[in-house]
Regions:
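A short alpha-helical cap/connector motif
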Residues: 1-134, 141-162, 166-214
Length: 214
C-alpha cells in the first residue's frame, strides 16, 4: 500500500498527535505483523488507530462491529475507547492473524471487550441484532458493498459506518484503473449516491469514508 499523504507528512501528523498509552505495545505488534504476515501494510497504523479510538469516544459507542480483524491494531485501539460495558465483535478468516490479535488484546487489558469471530463477514453480520453504534469495514474489498448494505439496517440512528482503504493508494483517481480498483470506485459511487446517508471521505492513511444515516 502506498501512502496517499506523503510519508514524512504522515510521520509529522503522528508526532504532533497525543501519544497512545499503548504505543510501545503497538510497536511490538507492528514488528511481529511485519515478521509473520505477508501483507503487513493492512495494519491501520498509529494515526488511523488513534482516530478510530477517538471516533468511538466521540460517538459514545457501546456496540461496535469490525469486519477484518487482521492482527488486531484497530480492534485494540477501538476497545481502548469503549466504556467498561462496551463490546466489539470482530471477524476475520485468518486464524493465525487473529491469534496474534487475541494475544496482544490480552496484554493490552482489553480482551474482555472484544468478541472474536472466525469466519466470513456476512455470516457474522447475520448473527447480530442491532442497533450497532459503529461499524468499521476493513475486510475484502469485493465484499464492501454487501457489508455496507447488510450493516446499514442494523446501524443506530446516530451510528457511524467507517469504510477503510477507499482511496486505494490513489489508484481510484487513475484514468485506467484495474478491476479491483474499479470495485472500490463502485462502492464509493454507491455510497455517494445513497440518499439514505451522508458520507464524507477523508484522506487519512489510505482513505476513510465516514457514513451516517440522514
Amino acid at each position: 500500500m502506498s501512502f496517499v499523504v506523503e510519508p514524512h507528512i504522515e510521520e509529522y501528523a503522528v508526532a504532533a498527535s497525543t501519544p497512545h498509552p499503548l504505543a510501545d505495545l503497538f510497536e511490538r505488534l507492528a514488528a511481529e505483523t511485519r515478521e509473520r504476515t505477508t501483507a503487513p501494510q493492512m495494519m491501520v497504523g498509529p494515526l488511523e488507530g488513534r482516530f478510530l479510538e477517538l471516533l468511538v469516544r466521540l460517538t459514545r459507542a457501546r456496540r461496535v462491529l469490525e469486519l477484518g480483524t487482521f492482527t488486531g491494531w484497530s480492534s485494540i485501539a477501538m476497545a481502548s475507547g469503549l466504556p467498561p460495558d462496551g463490546r466489539i465483535v470482530t471477524c476475520d478468516i485468518d486464524p493465525e492473524a487473529q491469534e496474534i490479535a487475541r494475544r496482544y488484546a490480552e496484554e493490552a487489558g482489553v480482551a474482555d471487550r472484544i468478541d472474536y469471530r472466525l469466519g466470513p463477514g456476512l455470516e457474522t453480520i447475520q448473527s447480530l441484532e442491532g442497533p450497532l453504534d459503529l461499524v468499521f469495514i476493513d475486510a475484502d474489498k469485493e465484499g464492501y458493498l454487501d457489508y455496507y448494505e447488510a450493516t446499514l439496517p442494523l446501524l443506530a440512528d446516530d451510528g457511524l459506518i467507517v469504510a477503510d482503504n477507499v482511496l486505494w493508494s490513489g489508484r481510484v483517481a487513475e484514468d485506467d484503473p484495474d478491476e479491483r480498483t474499479r470495485t472500490i470506485m463502485a462502492f464509493n459511487d454507491h455510497v455517494r449516491k445513497d440518499d439514505r446517508v451522508v458520507a464524507v471521505m477523508l484522506t487519512v492513511r489510505d482513505g476513510m469514508t465516514l457514513i451516517r444515516k440522514r
